[in-house]
Amino acid sequence: MKSNQFLGIAGMVLAMIACHKVEIIRPPEGGTSTPFSGKGTFKSNLLVQNRIPTSNTSPGDDESLVVSGDVGQYFSSTDFGKPSNPTKLPFLKSNTIAGLSLQPLPAGMKVVDYPGAFGVTADPEWNITSNWFKINPYEITYTGQATAEILQGNINSNRTLTADKTYLLRGQVFVNSGATLTIEPGTIIFGDSKPNDGILCINRGGKLIAKGTPEKPIVFTSPKLGTQRQRGDWGGIVVCGKAPNNKGTDVLVEGIEAGATGDGGKYGGNVPNDNSGEISYVRVEYAGIAVTPGNEVNGITFGSIGSATQLNHIIVSVGGDDGLEWFGGSVNARFIGLYDILDDDLDMDAGYTGNIQFVYSLRNPYAADVSLTGSLEITSSKTAGSSPQSAPVIANMTSVGPIYLVGEGAFNPNHEGGCRVSADARSQFINNVVIGWPRALMNF
């Protein structure tokens, strides 16, 4: 990674003028056209300094987009989030963007008068001056690694982790059906590194109550010290539930070893309002590993999580795979921060149907996964018509991409798109801000 702080000329020129360009991807010479399978709609979004604003969008699916190459036209500064200043936030000059009419939001989502995560100021619920809102973990130090209490194996009855101790996840730690793991505000949990990669897995019927506060967040982080810390130092968190997905009712989640016995790491069911607990005012740092090729643990993985579960105020930083990933389920999420994630910041698959609002994503321009990386990837199934079909709503997201951060030619070329929709997925991407991506919005 070059810095811890963190299609051609014609396309670049078109991205720099205030017009809307739709890219048509042609088949290879002598080939036949294959329809793209993503069915995303992109409305009322501000797109700034992207090489190509939209790819493979249909008329009516990309209404009220404002496209510009001038960051200074819309933002109160032109150095927010850059490697030299990663904690500076992208505040708008004005909440009103000429030519952009905000879309109505589904019931339960908060109505604000600006696109993106932040207007001219931050919504008070962001708590940007709190101990929780620490986007850049390189600036934070922890103690207690040597005296941490070891957590391993199975948790079969209710247990509480208290803030007067530190803890170390050793190997796969399962919270089994009928048990609730409660974590007090201010508690620090370290995840063991290889060969005992720490993974916390909440099984179906189990619950995690990780309810921090703005000044006493709960932190899951690396066991290493100072500059030794890096992405992939430990596994991550996995939560399994009983809500519907389109893969089945007994699916082994990614990142849990296939040898896991019993119900360990399996998700799926027919309980849309299933309750797996609460995760709020939590930070997850330096997580994300590949257990085997193509079988990765993310910062947090959600398998079939139901709508009664509470997800809010979560920051994932310096991740070795995706920040957050959903496989099916219907849980909603609000106030999410993502920094220096190797693969996708948010990944949704297998029939996920929740609503996500208030997301701030800041990329590391020098780090991207070889599988091609986006701020948001939405897929459903390789089998068209699988039910349920992924159909999330994403609103008030600000994604800060690599072109803005370091300029053309300087960033990792595996960065692809701000919001990418494929594999028979539907989505509504509305009232958002996308800055500095090779492609801002794309179906493929």
Locate the predicted segments by residue.
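C-terminal motif of bacterial Sec signal peptides marking the signal peptidase cleavage site
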Residues: 17-18
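Conserved H-D interstitial segment of serine endopeptidase catalytic domains
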Residues: 211
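Bacterial N-terminal signal peptides that target proteins for export
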Residues: 1-7
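Catalytic metal-binding/acid-base residues of hydrolase active sites
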Residues: 188
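Extracellular beta-rich repeat passengers
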Residues: 24-182, 192-205, 217-321, 325-342, ...
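Sec-dependent N-terminal signal peptides
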Residues: 7-14
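Short, conserved catalytic or interaction motifs in soluble domains
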Residues: 21
